[in-house]
C-alpha cells in the first residue's frame, strides 16, 4: 500500500485544517519546498498537494509554490483544489504535475471529468469528500445530497486513475480512518481507492491493510506525520512495498 504524505497550501504556507474548517488552521512549515524535499528524502514515492485557497475560491493562488515544489522533486506530484476547467487541468499537467484531482467538477460537470480522463490517461483522479455519506464541494463549504458511493460508481467506466476518498468528519482529527465508508467506497468503485482522513498512529495504517483486497491501494497522511504520531520511514516499512505484513485474505470486516 502506498503511503502518500500531504502538503496543504494556504497563502503558500504548509498548514492543516481541522475537519476542513478554514477557521481552525495549524501552520506547520513556512517553506513548503523544503518540507516536500524532506518527505522525498524519507522515502515518499508520491506527494499529495492541496491548494486550499484554490479549493475555496477557484483561483490559482498558490501556483508559484506548486511549480517550485514540482520542479524540486524527483517523485510524482498530484494536486487538488480549485481545478474546475479543462484548460486549468491541462495547464497543471503541462508544467510537470503527474496527476490532477477533480472534486467539485466531478459532481457539477461529470462529463468534463470523463473528457479529461480520455484525453489524459492515468492522470486524472476524482476526489470525493464526504460527510455522513454525502458529497461536499467547493472546499467543503457546500454540502450536496449526492451519495458518495453513487458518485464513485458513476466514474467506473470513465478511465480515471483512482478515487481519493476523504471522510471530512475524521480529517485532521487523528482519531482513525472511517473503515466502513472506505469499504463501501471500494465496493462501489472499479478503480483503486486512496484513503484520506483520520490516520493518527501506526495501528490506523495497519488497519487499512484489511481493505487492500477490496481495492484500497494507498493512504494520504498529513497531520499524523507533522505531529510526529507516525514516522514516514517506519510506516513505509510496515505497509509499503517490501513490508512484512500481508493483507488479510479473509474478509473479517463488515459485509
UniProtKB/Swiss-Prot annotation:
Its EC number is 5.3.1.16. It catalyses: 1-(5-phospho-beta-D-ribosyl)-5-[(5-phospho-beta-D-ribosylamino)methylideneamino]imidazole-4-carboxamide = 5-[(5-phospho-1-deoxy-D-ribulos-1-ylimino)methylamino]-1-(5-phospho-beta-D-ribosyl)imidazole-4-carboxamide. One of its GO terms (molecular function) is 1-(5-phosphoribosyl)-5-[(5-phosphoribosylamino)methylideneamino]imidazole-4-carboxamide isomerase activity. Disulfide bonds: none annotated. It is found in: Cytoplasm. Pathway: Amino-acid biosynthesis; L-histidine biosynthesis; L-histidine from 5-phospho-alpha-D-ribose 1-diphosphate: step 4/9. The active site is at residues 8, 129. Keywords: Amino-acid biosynthesis, Cytoplasm, Histidine biosynthesis, Isomerase. GO terms for biological process: L-histidine biosynthetic process; L-tryptophan biosynthetic process. It holds the Pfam family His_biosynth. One of its GO terms (cellular component) is cytoplasm. Belongs to the HisA/HisF family. This is 1-(5-phosphoribosyl)-5-[(5-phosphoribosylamino)methylideneamino] imidazole-4-carboxamide isomerase. It comes from Prochlorococcus marinus (strain MIT 9313).
